[in-house]
A protein has these predicted regions:
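Asp-box/BNR beta-propeller blade signature and adjacent active/binding-site loops
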Residues: 1-368
Length: 368
């Protein structure tokens, strides 16, 4: 695998509501057009955050001026913000947007999304919207009801569409903000057979009944044969350490899953890019060893990611005034790659990088 070219989709403006451009994702539409989305705000987590959107019709070499088509509605009588949006093309020109909405009023003194004393989370909800004109206009947001076992819902992946048209949405659970009980984290899959109007009961993807292992930031994709591969940022709560990325595969549309498999690389997986021949390109961010973003390719959704195929997309240099090095704040100023197969057989990877006060959205195109 090799890097074809790279660049910046959008540059930040320090000290403004565009100071931190983070959590990027990209969709390649049936006509080859790319649509990128990302979070824009003064900081990575702020009440003034908005979602920006940009397009490219030349495989990422140039991008349109960012637009802001998505509103942050009030829900349940409180003000909130949309933190992240993922796009899915259900048929040519027909898009679905999945979003994670954050309650910004119920706990106004919260230092962030999580309560450091309880490990609970502020209220979060999942929203959907539809577009019939390739994302030029959008329907109003609609909330996806969640069972109580989920708690505040976390979205880390776009809605997936199976070959038979069934939609699959993966969701991670959280504790409520003031809940002092032990956290038993889980990640589940919901299914819809009516275009996302209603959703069935959750099917467990990852859950440790002892509460020792957490499966965070699940990134998933559908292979040409209909199988789903899911890659988890795996955390051991007893040793307080991140393990290697673990993969699970489903052969029945996400209703049952294989046991977790260590894929041999560490830290946080990207959304995988699946090529028409079944090959899978998986980028990942390694914050705690060499502070980089890398990628490898596997021959199939359940295949081995060849170390010989590895390329480095980004290497982060911690500032001299970050005395903790790999544990300092600077390691959180880059990351969250997202990959997508393009119509010419290449793969686009988008990610954010910069400093604590200014983060840009970057792109790299790979020849797998």
């Amino acid at each position: 695998m090799r890097i074809i070219d790279s660049g910046i989709i959008s540059r930040s403006v320090p000290g403004t509501d565009r100071a931190t451009l983070t959590f990027p994702a990209v969709l390649c539409k049936a006509d080859g057009t790319l649509i990128a989305t990302w979070h824009s705000g003064l900081t990575k987590d702020c009440a003034d955050e908005v979602i920006e959107v940009s397009r490219s019709s030349d495989f990422g070499r140039t991008w349109s001026t960012p637009g802001r088509p998505f509103e942050s509605p009030a829900l349940h009588g409180v003000r909130g913000s949309v933190k992240i949006v993922y796009l899915t093309e259900r048929s040519p020109g027909r898009l679905m947007a999945a979003a994670m909405w954050i309650d910004r009023e119920t706990y106004p003194d919260a230092p962030g999304l999580f309560n450091p004393e309880t490990e609970g989370c502020v209220p979060m909800y999942i929203l959907l919207a539809d577009s019939e004109d390739s994302g030029e206009t959008w329907s109003s947001w609609r909330e996806v009801p969640m069972p109580e076992v989920i708690g505040p819902a976390s979205l880390t992946n776009p809605v997936m569409q199976l070959p038979d048209g069934t939609l699959v949405m993966t969701i991670e659970s959280n504790k409520h903000y003031l809940d002092t009980s032990r956290w038993y984290q889980r990640v589940v899959a919901f299914h819809s057979t009516d275009g996302g109007r209603t959703w069935g009961e959750p099917a467990i993807i990852g859950f440790d009944p002892t509460g020792r292992i957490f499966n965070w930031d699940l990134r998933s994709a559908v292979s040409p044969d209909g199988r789903i591969g899911a890659f988890a940022w795996t955390y051991n709560t007893e040793t307080e350490s991140y393990l290697n990325i673990h993969r699970r595969v489903s052969s029945d549309g996400g209703r049952t899953w294989s046991d977790p498999e260590d894929i041999g690389v560490t830290d946080q997986a990207a959304h995988p890019a699946v090529l028409p021949d079944g090959r899978v390109v998986l980028p990942w961010v390694d914050r705690f060893q060499d502070q980089s973003i890398k990628a490898r390719v596997a021959p199939s959704i359940d295949g081995t990611f060849d170390p010989e195929s590895e390329v480095t997309l980004y290497a982060h240099e911690a500032p001299a005034d970050d005395p903790k090095g790999a544990l300092g704040f600077s390691v959180w100023s880059f990351g969250l790659p997202y990959s997508e197969a393009l119509s010419d057989g290449s793969v686009m990877v988008v990610y954010y990088a910069g400093t604590e006060t200014a983060m840009d959205v970057h792109w790299t195109r790979l020849a797998p």
